[in-house]
């Protein structure tokens, strides 16, 4: 059976047999392949449970033999932030701390806490999300600017060093909050402060889940 997916649905992670990327855009293909590599690194996918096919620019079918071959393919398509998003991030970073806080509070006032951003993300797969834990209550369940921001800070921290740059969080948001700017800004910060390129897989673990004595601390306020 041929299964065509926009993202690898978490419930299918362990049972998925065939993923076709036929007739998809280049960005779609690379985003999906990055998802596969990241999920495999996090032990959510096994090579013997997955067959990945795509079509090259000449219409020839490519069958990836394993995760290493996917990584080799992706080496020619490094994860980058679009010029438009870089300009938006730069505008945000040039704001004063107070201006930036006001901007995000205004955006968070629109949030209805539907968690579409979580549902759309190909790398949100926890069987029980932090927002569903009520003992202790990490994030308040009602919608209000401050608690909405608490939720997004948690989400972005969990995505740090893992985001594949697909922008699904922004696309899924029914009220148009530019959530992707948070994760993509984090990408920039991680590259600048830790020297880890966007989309890079660190065998030791994700950048914010590991510690090195030589890590810089001068940017922490």
What are these regions (language model features)?
Residues 35-38, 120, 172, 181:
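Phosphate- and divalent-cation-binding pockets in alpha/beta enzyme and binding domains
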Residues 30-33, 115, 167:
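Alpha-helix N-cap/helix-start capping motif
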Residues 1-109, 122:
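Iron-sulfur-associated redox domains of electron-transfer enzymes in respiratory
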